[in-house]
Amino acid sequence: DEVMATLMTNSRTPALAELDLRAQVAAAGVVRRRMTELFDKYGAQIVVDVMADSLRDSEIMLRNRIRALPDGVWKTEEHVDHDGHSDSLTTIRLTLTKSGDTLIFDFTDSDDEAAGLINCTRPTLESGPFSAVLTHLCAGMTWNEGIMDRIRIDSRPGSIVDCNFPAPVASGVINSGWAALDASAAAVARMMLDGQESRKLTMAGWAGAPYGVNIFGKRENGRSFATMLGLSGLQGGGARSFADGYDAAGYLHSPRCGAMNVETAEARFPILHLFRRLAPDSGGA
């Protein structure tokens, strides 16, 4: 309770924050209970062996799919257009090398870390290539960490995608981290275009970044409110070789994630929607 009180004291929306945090704690408790039930029913060794087999199966399946692709080198760039301090471009540069059954994502030529909050750390960077490979190459497979055995990620400490403490990172996930994802997806797509069989499964880039409409103010009773309307979950998917991209597809790494219903938003917050529409031929066209 003391820890919770400390956290809530530092939140502008303590009621929502406490509810969210307690939900996460409850979810962790459910996972622990379900895992204990599995161990009790089948025995710890069997459960551990099945987990290991699942990781190994995914690694083998991805290895075979990578082998079927042509060896080569592909380069891509993505940009972040403002770091919160200066209106200047920061560039994420990627060189993808495919050799045999391994993919190497090299970000070492990316720009140095920024003064503002757009930097990301190494774990955030790693999620970019991982997500791109999962979405493009792992259909019909179990998505798990075994896939990472076929991927190598090179980065330079002190760069925009592998910053050093105390570089600011508050918006890193949706700025440089997202740019690393977009660069990875573009490189994988270009690689697939060079393959005879993989070409028909290639996708263009999805929406380049997420966005959120942040609203705040006071209710009629004087109490404060604040929230983000996560409308970017309705962005379009990348065009495919045989058809347009899906409308309102979500994110490349989280398809069909959706967004808050208009009615729900208006019931919870003092706001009014005049309309919510899809823009023709926008992201995902």
Where are these regions (language model features)?
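Glycine/proline-enriched, intrinsically flexible loops and inter-domain linkers
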Residues: D1-A285
